[in-house]
UniProtKB/Swiss-Prot annotation:
It is a multi-pass membrane protein. Pfam families: DUF2614 (PF11023). InterPro entries: UPF0295 (IPR020912). GO terms for cellular component: plasma membrane. Keywords: Cell membrane, Membrane, Transmembrane, Transmembrane helix. Belongs to the UPF0295 family. Its main location: membrane. This is UPF0295 protein Aflv_0370. It is found in: Cell membrane.
Length: 120
């Protein structure tokens, strides 16, 4: 069975959500050090930094999302956003491309890299 792909926007949003949960767990970890206010404060500040990083990532992907190309998926007929030369539909995971040279080829995220690997 092949690799399960996800749209790039959803991957970045999932990363931002994981930063929030990491921040919460780090802050909860600080509760175990109630007897040492300095260590507890460090854990709380570190957790807050994770949550602030998540906010920055959400803001960045929101700004990036407004500039993306919107296409209609041929499988589910829903409007989805594409980042790069190849991406997958956000709803049905159908491989999508706007590059005519890649039509009909096997989907691979390596097509989005600026430098292509040359086979020797």
């Amino acid at each position: 069975m092949g690799v399960k792909y996800s749209s790039k926007i959803n991957k970045i949003r999932t990363f931002a959500l994981s930063l929030i949960f990491i921040g919460f767990f780090v802050m909860y970890g600080g509760i175990f050090f109630r007897t040492s206010p300095i260590v507890m404060t460090l854990f709380m500040i570190l957790g807050l930094l994770f949550i602030i990083a998540s906010t920055v990532v959400y803001f960045w992907i929101g700004m990036l999302s407004t500039k993306t190309v919107q296409v209609v998926c041929p499988s589910c007929n829903k409007v989805t956003k594409m980042l790069g030369r190849v991406d997958v539909c956000m709803y049905c995971n159908e491989p999508l491309t706007l590059d005519p040279t890649l039509e009909g080829k096997e989907f691979d995220e390596k097509y989005n890299r600026k430098t292509r690997d040359k086979k020797s």
